[in-house]
Amino acid sequence: MNISAEYWLHHAVFYAMLFLIHYFCGLLVIHRNLKVNYTRKINHFAFFFLPTLLSMVIDYPYSAATFFIDLVCAIIFLTFFIAPVRNRVRVLSVMFCSFDRPEDRPLTLTWLYTQFIASYLVLIPLLAYFESHALLPVIMIIIIANGVGDGLAEPVGIRFGKRKYTTYALFTQEKYVRSYAGSACVFITTFIAILAFHSYFSPIQFIAAVLTVPVLITLAEAFSPHTWDSPLIYAVGGALLIGILHFL
């Protein structure tokens, strides 16, 4: 397994920046009383889009091996925040405050661990399929739907979401709240993403994608367990795109 030096440099810079962002967001929560719901989404955007931005400067060859190492790195990153570690390292404790929503306790890390693993398990076959059919850029539709749409859903819902609905969560009987305004962010973002990648569809495929993908991804986000949006968005959106591109 030959991993390029550019890959390691890219990820060293990425995780250094990610640690800094988490730390400063944690300080904002502790000293400025900024809502964790907002800082958590700042972290979310950083995790999704910093790698892409860094790749413009530090590019590396993609492979199944690098994708697997990405998953390992994400799990190691989360492991820094388990209680025995963060309680002994003040910096990590501050960073943990940037994504530890009070309503998620004591399952904050459990949900993040399981969501990361489930998301990667869904993405691996999707990446393999789209790459084998020379359609790899199409997967960006569901990544944008999750990264931008779901990323905006919570802060928009908190600020503007007067009409809300409840959803369940794994490993608990508690109910959690989502907003129609937040779900609208997922719908609009997915619609725009399809428009941006329209060149990969035939006219009939494009019409089918526009009419079905935003609706079903929005429903996937709405009915997914609390904090478990990503794997459901990827699974539903990916399966639907494969169906459209393969059968139409």
Question: In which residue ranges do the predicted regions lie?
Answer:
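Aromatic-rich transmembrane-lumenal/periplasmic boundary elements in polytopic membrane proteins
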Residues: 72-74
